[in-house]
Amino acid sequence: MIESKIITPERAIEFVKSNDQIVTGLGCSEGRAFLSVLHQRADDLKNVHISNCLPMATLPYMEPEYKDSFFLDGWFYSPVMRRMHKQGNASFIPNNLHMAAMHRLDAIKPNIYVGVCTPPDKHGYVSLSTGNTYERRMIDAADLVILEMNKNFPRTFGDVELHVSKVDWLIDADYDVPALPNIETSEKDEKIGQLIASQIDDGDNIQVGIGGIPNAVIKALYGKKDLGIHTEMLTSEVARLAKAGVITGDRKSLHRGKMVTTFIMGDQELYDFCDENPAVMVLDGNYVNRPDVIAQNDNQVSLNTTLEIDLTGQCASESIGPIQYSGTGGQADTARGAQEAKNGRSFIALYSTAMVKNRETGEREEKSKIVAQLTPGAIVSLQRSDVDRVVTEYGIAELRGKSVVQRVELLIGIAHPAYREQLLFDARRMGIIGGH
């Protein structure tokens, strides 16, 4: 059956028409064999929109010279998308992850879906491998489905099995699964990781992402027992913790014994761990990240990071001022879901300071990341009423249910000591709290 479906990337791009809406898989599953040659059609095409999420490869079609032909709409910005945004051929799609696919389908009709799959099994089923954040819904809605069949991708289970009869065309691909570099943890990361780990108990269920702080939290959990996983992203550090026997899922109240995720991204060790592993379930993002589903996990712990937080608890996690940097992703989904769970907890972590470029002088200068007022134009990813526990290297501020006056005091208490007096002065001057 599959031989008649196999075509070259050059043949596949012939199906693209001007004004088409193309959707690509997330991250590793972006379909880079197809996208690597797409620029060859630039002279024939106008206004082709490509919806993507966390694209990893810098490819020719992204160059400014092709922006009249190809425009990218992204659910979550990567360094590639930040560069394209700056040059004028990319834009952000505001979303909460659990509704990203449905809301996009309200706005567009996908003409072509491009992604990655494994070779079919003996029953004719391929696996969508590293993700189903929105992929299966887009496949079901698309006029034409083109998948790059790649034996190097892990065969995973969950909602990712797709019969080859549902695929219009296959591209025979043989590149390695795109990998992320391992992120070293700093002294600040490790301090924050230890603080958060001290509030995680045996049997807790964890949601965690990637980066220095999340990695440090995972590394601080090796003394725990019977942890579970219900997470948006499955990472290399989580796989290592599972291989060490710390993650068993034996005490989970939902999907006992299973590590539930919506996408997988990390190193080759992670991909090998997930390959044909029945303990890993890759499920639809609308299910995994829906707050009411997350809340069914007793003892759910959510860990997210932010770029800036004001003294009332508003988190600007995806932009630097008005300029898009990353995305909302599942931050609001997981923070809300965890707090609705029995004995659930949500952590927002950040360094107390950052080195920020002065727009006037061009020099980098230290700035407090806990501020009286967010940077003008900053996008609020998590509203203050959804913030539970905030962590810096100076401690933990428990904000859930607290008044603004209490929040100001608690957040100043975990700010860098050099900025605490000014923060209190600003809070009074601006009327955030009363008194002089």
Where do the protein language model's features map onto the residues?
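Conserved alpha/beta enzyme-core scaffold
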Residues: M1-H436
